[in-house]
């Protein structure tokens, strides 16, 4: 394999990137070209101040074999190489390479990083690797082979709901008390005189207006309001516009008495829904708008044959009450 360092995302074709991603070990919204490029332009909404892009490609017989979207920055008082998208807003990260090429790609990548940038970094620190990623074992084996220190730990749970039938099938598989609670809240909302409606934003929407409405609901939560500082809002707005343009943004609202009262922001990608964020107004709390909207979201998944709802990172109680089962993302470190 021939490895090349690129200085900018403009040096690689977006279609070539996304085509390889479709056959890669992981195909997630966070690894698509437009997401990775947008994340880098905003440095994670200001998460990283001083960072240098290390966008590395590998070719074999003039064919693109692998992509390692990386950057180098001072982290925990050491110069570290991280996956582009680290850490806070990209739930799943990895290298982009087919399974059959993966082991030799990782081995060659570490050789390239050691020979080309050996004096500029002291560790690899890769967050948000899915727990079934072959990259985890490959990094461990390569570190052992080189006599480097290796450490791996669980970083965050990522609860998921497996879906393979109707909404009633889904309800029948969750705990009885929660099943009754979901049904009761949905029925109460449906019978309300306030005309409760679930609406999904279409491709003809005024997307800027809808995104701003979502943000207005999101910041009703004080913690989310603190998170959504101006640089992060700019970052997320750009990401959502790209997802909308590429037809995988899923934005649903619950309207009560003609007013959008709860919002569910997801990525509809690879036949599953990836639950990215949400927002709920303080109005009409008696109708449980957040719960009712989540139930409608899962019902939409069932009606449209999505095989999974992925809550992504976080161990909030409601995820398990709706039937989420833990998977995890990992942190893998290598020190020379």
Each language-model region and where it sits:
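A conserved beta-strand-loop-helix scaffold within acyl/acetyltransferase catalytic domains
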Residues: 2-82, 86, 128-285
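C-terminal end-helix/capping segment
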Residues: 328-330
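Short beta-strand-to-coil "C-cap" segments at the C-terminal boundary of structured domains/repeats
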Residues: 162-163, 333-336
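Conserved beta-strand edge residues that scaffold enzyme active sites
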Residues: 157, 203, 315-316, 333
